[in-house]
Amino acid sequence: MDDIIQLIHRHFEDDDLAQQRPVEFIRCVWCRFESISRTEWRDAGVQGLKPELLAVMPMVNYCGEIIARYHGVRYSVYRTYRRIDTDEIELYLSREVGV
């Protein structure tokens, strides 16, 4: 693991006017980045997604977050895959508007 990514958990809380406001909890975790395969690129493209990053990290560092930030850019976690032979999980990231 040679890089750091921010995983963002978002939930909503009521303010004084009973309006729901988003609250984000950010954690920094170690990971490494790998290339996205041609198969993943094709399959994601069929669904209208454009995969940009593949982050690999220990399974214990991931708690179901659906938003990540790397070098100031926010990404959506559109798919995860648990590697069977190790204790690692793959996060497939796509940049989306409004994340």
Each model region followed by its residue ranges:
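Short, conserved turn/kink motifs that form compact alpha/beta structural patches or helix kinks used as
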Residues: 20-99
